[in-house]
Amino acid sequence: MGLSIGSLLICVFLGIVPFATANTNSSSYEEHRNYLLNIFHNPFVNDSIKEKNIPQLIAFYQRYPTDVPLSDADRQQFERFIHDYREYRAVLVDGAPPQGGSFGNIFGHFLGRVGTRYISSLFNKKREERKSNHAYIIEDYN
């Protein structure tokens, strides 16, 4: 009996590990990153649209926590923003989460500080990867 429980735990562990380790080379990673950049790094997208996509930004940050280099202070600010956002969304108004409006102040403060740095770092990392891939292709061509 003990052996089968141990085997079961190993199987569960092996099933969880691939999902817990983020593969930044996967197409879903690229799609998610491009989606976020198209929203948060685009000056033509209004704050309302950006605000609606905060859950996707948080999900990306939590799925790939080390992908974008942030200082410890920036990381702490991002974590504080996530906490504040979730706390705000947990408040129910007539049985439903807030539908917008007053959160704009928190969102604007976030965009003015660490959010802008996070998105810029994400964009710069993508640009560096393109340069690296382009140099690799040229090197192979020669």
Swiss-Prot record:
Keyword line: Immunity, Innate immunity, Secreted, Signal
Signal peptide coordinates: 1-22
Compartment(s): Secreted
Gene this chain is encoded by: TotX
The protein's name in its UniProt record: Protein Turandot X
One GO BP annotation of this record: cellular response to oxidative stress
Matching InterPro entries: Turandot
Pfam families: Turandot
Any one cellular-component term (Gene Ontology): extracellular region
Family: Belongs to the Turandot family.
Induction: By a variety of stressful conditions including bacterial infection, heat shock and paraquat feeding.
Function: A humoral factor that may play a role in stress tolerance.
